[in-house]
């Protein structure tokens, strides 16, 4: 990273833990990185990583099926570092959180994340279908909502927190 002059990087959740296991070095902050973008950093490593390496890890939620149309990112303060927060909705994305029976959960309760584009075309920016698998497509897109299988809760300020996979 230092040699490339990169100013942004993409990370997977395990990478901060791996880098934190490397012995500290006086050059840990000697780079041009302004931020990292990814998902799944262990809450106990998030603040430690940012302090040691000197740049924020911007947590986000997306999946292949959501494409760019459903990406949600913690790109605005407060980011709620260290508790699996992946940001707030934008005006381009709508969500619902449902229980195992398909009913919306009460405020603050965890539920499966359903997501779609806001506006006339709920699939705008999302995947169109699974290749040669109409049944799987129908199972994933129900009633114009993408069923993600991710369990999420929404905080009082609208921030979204990853809880688990269904």
Question: Residue ranges of each PLM-predicted region?
Answer:
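Alpha-helical "lid/cap" subdomains adjacent to substrate-binding clefts that gate access
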Residues: 15, 37-45, 88, 115-116, ...
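Short Gly/Pro-enriched turn/cap motifs at secondary-structure boundaries
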Residues: 83-89, 140-144
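Residue-level recognition of short loop/turn positions
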Residues: 99-102, 110, 156-157
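Active-site glycine/GP-rich loop and adjacent strand/helix microenvironment
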Residues: 72-75, 86-88, 104-109, 128-130
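Gly/Ser/Thr-rich phosphate-binding loop
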Residues: 2-12, 20-80, 94, 101-104
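Active-site glycine-centered loops adjacent to acidic/histidine catalytic or metal-binding residues
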Residues: 62, 87, 150
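Conserved ATP-binding/catalytic segment of the ANL
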Residues: 106, 114-166
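Residues embedded in well-ordered beta-strands
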Residues: 94-96, 112
